[in-house]
Amino acid sequence: MNIKSEFFRVDFIIGARRLSNYFWATVVFLGSLGFFIVGVSSYLQKNIVFFLSASDILFTPQGIVMCFYGIAGLFLSFYLWFTIFLDIGSGYNEFDKKKGIISIFRWGYPGQNRRIKLSFPIKDVQAIKLEVKEVLPARRMIYIKIKGQQDIPLNRIAENITLREMEDKAADLARFLKVSIEGL
């Protein structure tokens, strides 16, 4: 959902709350839980869960390794769920012609940089830059070029958009800001 008018525009950015992140966090959690249960079952010499058999696994060394991978996977899955819960990377790009300001806001990790907000005068915008790298996975980025600053990305790195959609977004933004498009 984006907000557009003649003098004001807001583009919302989806962060970590994507379907793929939910999928991978669940898969990692279930897989690592299975590893951990099999490792503990090999130590206890009985099956904790009926569908995970550990009768052929010796505790030393396989059971220890299974427990280790299970614990490591659980930590990784908790990290993924924490990232999803905080919605890291979400935010918005706000372009206000009346105030003459561009504001870019993103949510970060807890601490000093939890809220990341950059503001620039619209008059300092030089161009909208497109970057396309057709490697696996394909990387299609839209940047805003600001005088005396690094190029600032306006979309997610993992955003899966077609070349046509990217060009349309960039052209629409360039028309709104009355700047040129670079790249491609």
From Swiss-Prot:
Protein name as it appears in the record: Photosystem I assembly protein Ycf4
One GO term describing the cellular component: chloroplast thylakoid membrane
Primary site of residence: plastid
Family: Belongs to the Ycf4 family.
Localization per record: Plastid, Chloroplast thylakoid membrane
Intrachain S-S bonds: none
Keywords of this entry: Chloroplast, Membrane, Photosynthesis, Plastid, Thylakoid, Transmembrane, Transmembrane helix
Family annotation (InterPro entries): PSI_Ycf4_assembly
Task of the protein: Seems to be required for the assembly of the photosystem I complex.
BP terms from Gene Ontology: photosynthesis
Short name of any one Pfam family annotated for the protein: Ycf4
Membrane association type: Multi-pass membrane protein
Bilayer-spanning residue ranges: 21-43, 63-85
